Swiss-Prot record:
Protein name: Thymidylate kinase
Gene3D superfamilies in alphabetical order: P-loop containing nucleotide triphosphate hydrolases
Positions with a binding annotation for ATP: G12, L13, E14, G15, A16, G17, K18, T19
Transferase among keywords: yes
Family classification: Belongs to the thymidylate kinase family.
UniProt keyword Zinc-finger present: no
Reactions catalysed: dTMP + ATP = dTDP + ADP
Pfam families from the UniProt entry: Thymidylate_kin (PF02223)
HAMAP family, A to Z: Thymidylate_kinase (MF_00165)
One GO MF term: ATP binding
UniProt keywords, alphabetically: ATP-binding, Kinase, Nucleotide biosynthesis, Nucleotide-binding, Transferase
Top-level taxonomy: Bacteria, Pseudomonadati, Pseudomonadota, Gammaproteobacteria, Chromatiales
Amino acid sequence: MTERGCFITVEGLEGAGKTTCLQAIEQMLLEAGIDRPLFTREPGGTPFGEALRGALLDPQYRGLTAEAEALTVFAARAEHLAQVIRPTLDAGRWVISDRFTDATYAYQGGGRGLGDERIAVLERWVHGGFTPDRTLLLDVDPTVGRSRVAHRGDGEDRFEQERDPFFQAARAAYARRAAADPERFRCIDANRPEGEVAEQVRAGVADLLPVGGRP
């Protein structure tokens, strides 16, 4: 019987440095000899999910209700789980996702003010008890994150256009999630320089690697 793969999620606000984090993980898995890890993202990961992602990020839908937003995210997630994440893990491959359900608790539950209860109902329905093996939370001051986004110079999507109160609420929701599940979460100070963040990332996943592949 094929051993199930490992599922790692990377969470954080806009400008937290998730790209740097994912690159560090990719290099680490390569060095450890992990075969064909799959890197994916949320919302997205499937043609259906990517179409919904485009709508969610489009500034023309700025007035979308919080409820519609949460339901759209979970519609994309249901397809992502069924078509990509679960089959890949069952085949013994590792899956690394740029955001997952903790982001919904943060952005819709916290930032939009829906609270945890309604998100939890959707999670139970869509997940059926499924949860990541490890979540790396890149904790960044919203002011720092927004400054990084502004320096990219590629325009702001619908969420990047939000202001500090939204991101402060999302950050607080992330912190509550991490405090409630310390075994799964590894919190990383993403305000630090890129090299230091990469080192924290490597330390955050090292124990998941096969013994011979650990640094």
